[in-house]
């Protein structure tokens, strides 16, 4: 076990568990005072940074019987829960106070700025979140160094903030650094290393670096331990291959995922039908019209028999439209018109 992995466990820092597709985002490692960015729900409220002076930085809330007694004796109605804007304002006040008392390069200030950036991200204030995470990372590097676990957490938060703000190229730069460090410390097959490689592949694909994306998807597929995550990676790989015109390779990946999901979930499951639909579209893109018709028709029939789920019903409509298009491409106009 590496030094930093041991320290992560001793200090309570750990990789947060979250299931996501290869096209979506994953949480940063968690520690008690350092929060995750937007849309990485952990179920933990924003913590206040530990005060250097020993005095609380925010008023403590009454709980349980004490809170009830306070309401009874005062006769005042219980105040409504604070809004996101109120929480952000409180975090802004906390940060200003810490900057004035301790300066910007103090651990408490760094924690407070990270928490404020997190709240901005949760509120959808993406640009403000990015700006605060950038400042937090610069301060963390100056105080803790590049390789400190807390710096890594903040760097991952910034990478996620860049992704949320539609800046995949900037996010890729952060994931590259995280991947190098995790590979050095933990090895290529470690769960967090694979996660960083997957996110790097996603960002490369979204920023148009398709060959690099394919390389990292393929490596992540080799290293990942989970069957479900391997399927997600294959879907991401197939998307990168399709975008680069490698339709036959994309079809091969989709066929493997479809076979696996049929075994695990059944052919009528939404996740299975979604891949079935993608396979039919891949055949259409490859100019294999007859096979596209066969695959899309099969998926459409299965969806019709599994349409109790509203999501399946919506997918059924898309399948019907794409099947009609495949019939047209194959010169089968009468069958296409019957679906329109």
Question: Positions of the model-derived regions?
Answer:
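Intrinsic-disorder-linked linear interaction elements in eukaryotic regulatory proteins
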Residues: 1-340
């Amino acid at each position: 076990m590496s030094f930093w992995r041991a320290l992560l466990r001793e200090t309570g820092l750990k990789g947060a568990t979250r299931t996501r597709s290869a096209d979506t985002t994953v949480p940063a490692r968690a520690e008690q005072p350092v929060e995750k960015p937007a849309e990485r729900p952990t179920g933990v409220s924003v913590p206040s940074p530990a005060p250097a002076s020993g005095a609380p930085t925010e008023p403590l809330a009454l709980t349980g019987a004490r809170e009830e007694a306070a309401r009874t004796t005062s006769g005042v109605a219980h105040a409504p829960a604070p809004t996101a804007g109120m929480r952000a304002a409180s975090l802004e006040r906390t940060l200003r106070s810490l900057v004035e008392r301790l300066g910007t390069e103090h651990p408490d200030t760094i924690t407070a700025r990270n928490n404020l950036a997190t709240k901005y991200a949760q509120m959808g204030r993406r640009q403000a979140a990015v700006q605060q995470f950038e400042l937090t990372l610069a301060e963390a590097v100056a105080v803790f160094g590049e390789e400190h676990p807390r710096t890594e957490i903040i760097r991952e938060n910034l990478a996620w903030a860049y992704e949320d703000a539609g800046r995949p190229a900037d996010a890729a730069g952060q994931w590259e650094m995280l991947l190098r460090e995790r590979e050095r410390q933990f090895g290529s097959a470690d769960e967090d290393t694979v996660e960083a490689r997957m996110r790097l592949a996603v960002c490369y694909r979204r920023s148009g670096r398709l060959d690099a994306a394919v390389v990292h998807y393929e490596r992540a597929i080799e290293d990942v331990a989970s069957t479900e995550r391997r399927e997600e990676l294959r879907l991401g790989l197939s998307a990168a291959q399709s975008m680069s015109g490698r339709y036959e390779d994309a079809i091969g990946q989709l066929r493997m995922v479809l076979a696996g999901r049929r075994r695990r979930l059944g052919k009528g499951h939404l996740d299975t039908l979604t891949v079935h639909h993608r396979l039919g579209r891949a055949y259409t893109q490859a100019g294999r019209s007859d096979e596209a018709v066969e695959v899309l028709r099969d998926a459409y029939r299965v969806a019709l028999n599994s349409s109790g789920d509203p999501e399946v019903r919506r997918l059924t409509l898309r399948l019907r439209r794409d099947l009609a298009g495949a019939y047209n491409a194959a010169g089968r106009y009468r069958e296409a018109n019957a679906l329109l």
